[in-house]
Amino acid sequence: AKPVDSFARAAELEAELKRNVRGEVRFDRGSRALYATDASNYRQIPIGLVIPRDADDVIAAVAACRKFDAPLLPRGGGTSLAGQCCNVAVVLDFTKHMNRVLEINPAEKWARVQPGIVLDALQRALQPHQLIFAPDPSTHNRCTVGGMIGNNSCGAHSLLGGKTVDNVEELKIVLHDGTQMTVGATTAMELAEIIAQGGRRGEIYAGLRGLVNEHSTRIRANYPRI
């Protein structure tokens, strides 16, 4: 998507977001400056900021940005070292409201969380059950699980417990076109069923299967062992 031209439509976009988002919408210069950097040397002043209260706010923000052809950038704790949190986009900050543990299943050893939860907060919630979330980057007291997923973060014990990608069972996602779906590890039979069902989800999975079939040999030969 193209950035809003010189912020020419920023006022319209801000008004659209304020009409449809219950959380905070900030387009003032001070807020934009606060979100212009992460832990790297990069700096990009965003179009504006949305602090969603819930998933409905996220869906509304996606719809507004789609309407105005504005990029959207989900943000965690801003601990990235390579500018991942910096862009001329509408920034979604999940850390204020969408930061909870929703469910813990000790028997099956999984937890369901919101993207803005800080890793240490998750670890504290898991501790009574003698469980941990294996990846442990050095920024564990301020990085978020959503940011870890976006970055596929590792840590000192990742050789033992794996990277973030190895510790995520499924994700509930919303795409730029508004499609909502749950994704995760998929068997060949499940993949065939999803594609047969058609719709946007089936279209996406069929496209992914096509990419795998076309490029799998090259990927396996060249993908780094990390």
What are these regions (language model features)?
Residues D57, A70, N152-G155:
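Charged, amphipathic alpha-helical interaction segments
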Residues R100-I226:
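FAD-binding subdomain of flavoenzyme oxidoreductases
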Residues L72-P74, L81, L122:
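Extended, hydrophobic alpha-helical segments in both membrane/secreted and soluble proteins
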Residues A1-K67, G77-K109, S138:
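N-terminal flexible segment immediately upstream of the FAD-binding catalytic core
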